[in-house]
Amino acid sequence: MSERKYFGTDGIRGKVGSSPITPDFVLKLGWAAGKVLARHGSRKIIIGKDTRISGYMLESALEAGLAAAGLSAAFTGPMPTPAVAYLTRTFRAEAGIVISASHNPYYDNGIKFFSIDGTKLPDEVEAAIEAELDKPLTCVESAELGKASRIVDAAGRYIEFCKSTFPNALSLSGLKIVADCANGATYHIAPNVLRELGAEVITIGTSPDGMNINKECGATDVRALQARVVAENADLGMAFDGDGDRLIMVDHRGDKVDGDQILYIVAREALRQGKLHGGVVGTLMSNMGLELALKQLGIPFARAKVGDRYVLETMQEKGWRMGAENSGHVIILDQTTTGDGIVAGLQVLAAMARNHMSLTDLCSGMTLLPQVLVNVRFAGQCDPLQDTAVQHSCAEVERQLAGRGRVLLRKSGTEPLIRVMVEGEDLQQVTDLANTIADAVKAAS
């Protein structure tokens, strides 16, 4: 397939006010998507958003474009990305659209689409939408224009769905949990789910103002959560990102529990329950410690390219039901169709309750190898990965690791960054080697 002009690995994303995240482009995008999606029968689209101030502007633009193409929009208001996927399925809508830039700062935003079955749009549908964007906008006849409505009980519907993934025979009674909602889309969802299941809940990151999403909080910055868990003598902490599709946890000691460890816990529990179908999928970034721990359990493991859509594709290719990224995207197809931070967290909590074990104990069967990730910003027109000095630097680092570690360089799918990852047995060595490669990348940028 030819290279796409606008769609990246997770929809369309950028800085608000700069192409392509402008009101006029998003209106045209709504129209183009409407033209393509209307061919498939249904005429309703679910639109959700996170808590960014630009969400108001962009949802209005999307709705106008969809209406011009003859499709109606149903707004959920601030709602986690996986909630939009769920509501798209239950309403039998033709598609769901999420206005979010996930873990990015408030001044970024993006648009991503879900199919009628709650999975991300196939590449060929995204390509068809891009093809329509090159055509002049034409409006349907007045009698065929789309309408707008609001799903007033969207939050309640999703809360009940999340609770339904937690066994009826279990309770969270007696657990003290700190929930960090990143001032994002889970702020009015996650605390209610946990409280209704019996937990004592302390919240941070639940006062969104349109500009504080992901700011020093949430899954990408758990320092405040770690401190609060220890200060409150809580049993654990749960950190979601801005749109609620990621989860990072913190144990009672304040130690971080990442997506690799969460995947290990839920996979081992599924194995114990006789509900693990085949193996599990990680990514090129997944820690070697995960692979070794799963091997000890006899659980097959495969690595996909980085990106939750590629994890899901590999799961589907192999017929497996579980996968994750170490960043906290955890996909459990027996429960939902996409990464869902709340649902993933509930499966960990169920394992704790069922086995009468702490989060620390559940992690004890897996030892993470030291892994250092350095992000290097680069100018869009250059490609540091093709630079001879960078390639020589990587080769030298691999020689020093002598087969007892890994080196991975890749471009981010959502930002102009080169991600440098080095993994090995000694943290200081790994840190030094990662910085050596990062310096070479900077020089080439």
Curated annotation (Swiss-Prot):
One of its GO terms (biological process) is carbohydrate metabolic process. GO terms for cellular component: cytosol. Its EC number is 5.4.2.10. CDD domains: GlmM (cd05802). Keywords: Isomerase, Magnesium, Metal-binding, Phosphoprotein. Binds 1 Mg(2+) ion per subunit. The keyword Magnesium applies. The keyword Translocase does not apply. Activated by phosphorylation. PROSITE patterns: PGM_PMM. Its cofactor is Mg(2+). GO terms for molecular function: magnesium ion binding; phosphoglucosamine mutase activity; phosphomannomutase activity. It catalyses: alpha-D-glucosamine 1-phosphate = D-glucosamine 6-phosphate. InterPro entries: A-D-PHexomutase_a/b/a-I (IPR005844), A-D-PHexomutase_a/b/a-I/II/III (IPR016055), A-D-PHexomutase_a/b/a-II (IPR005845), A-D-PHexomutase_a/b/a-III (IPR005846), A-D-PHexomutase_C (IPR005843), A-D-PHexomutase_C_sf (IPR036900), A-D-PHexomutase_CS (IPR016066), Alpha-D-phosphohexomutase_SF (IPR005841). The modification Phosphoserine is found at residue 102. The active site is at 102 (phosphoserine intermediate). Mg(2+) binds at residues 102, 241, 243, 245. Pfam families: PGM_PMM_I (PF02878), PGM_PMM_II (PF02879), PGM_PMM_III (PF02880), PGM_PMM_IV (PF00408). It comes from the Bacteria. Catalyzes the conversion of glucosamine-6-phosphate to glucosamine-1-phosphate. Belongs to the phosphohexose mutase family. HAMAP family: GlmM_B (MF_01554_B). This is Phosphoglucosamine mutase. It comes from Edwardsiella ictaluri (strain 93-146). The gene is glmM.
